[in-house]
Amino acid sequence: MLNRIYRSKYNLQFDHVSHTSNDDTITVAVSLYNYEKEILDCLESIKNQTYRNLSLMIVDDCSQKDNSLERAILWTKRNSERFVRATVVRHEFNQGLAQARNTAFAASDTRALFIMDADNMIYPRAIEVLAPWVLDEGYAAAYTQLEFFGDVSGLGYADYWSPDFFRENNYVDAMALISTSAWQTVRGYTHMEGGWEDYDFWCKFVDSGLDAIFIPQILCRYRVHGTSMLRTDTVNNHNDLIVEMRMRHPWLAVGS
């Protein structure tokens, strides 16, 4: 099933299994691309989670401008016993954010993955709060409110899950706990120029009749800087993206 959804070309850089995973094990999947300065803050926030039954999957999307991969491998080796399984893989060539997330799902063996980029952070109770809603209550995904930090400070735009809310724009960030079965149902993330992969992913949830739940607590930290999706807002490709999104999801009213 997984191979039919996504075929990935990557090399295993590090893999350590402390003990066998079980139905309650959650994988935190980190997408890494040239974030040498931020990656350690991200990983420390994962290490400090109160939810102990965690695996870690770092997918390096062929970083070349800095020592991101080397730092990630060294940190993971030093902290591998904290996790059920700690894994670092590297794409053979740069494949984009959507493919990095697909690689994480395809290479993991847990029922759910928490998705985050290497420049972001999570508060210690994030996974503990989200886990029961996906593992026990059966929601396809669970997400919280964001805290912006970096170049911009403030609260995010997350709200209660409603298909109607997606008609005009995306309001749910990638940082969410997602069931592997839901990822399979929507056939993974689709690469879209300009960074609208997350919007498309959640719209595929709507298309498939999947339910997610919003937890109104501030548990995820989104770093805003010059290259973040929040700041660039994909302006250069905005009109083309609107056309593509409305072709993929005709019920959208974005751009009207």
Can you annotate each of these PLM segments?
Residues 159-177:
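A recurrent flexible, glycine/aromatic-enriched loop bordering the glycosyltransferase active site
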Residues 113:
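Short aromatic/hydrophobic "clamp" motif used to bind/position activated sugar donors
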Residues 125-156:
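Conserved donor NDP-sugar-binding/catalytic core segment of glycosyltransferases
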Residues 1-45:
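N-proximal low-complexity "stem/linker" segments adjacent to membrane-targeting elements
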Residues 145, 212-219:
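Catalytic beta-strand/loop signature of glycosyltransferases that borders the donor
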Residues 91-108:
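Glycine-rich, basic loop-to-helix element that forms the pyrophosphate-binding segment
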Residues 47-89:
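Acidic donor-binding segment of Leloir-type glycosyltransferases
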Residues 194-203:
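Acidic donor-binding loop at a coil-to-helix junction in glycosyltransferase catalytic cores
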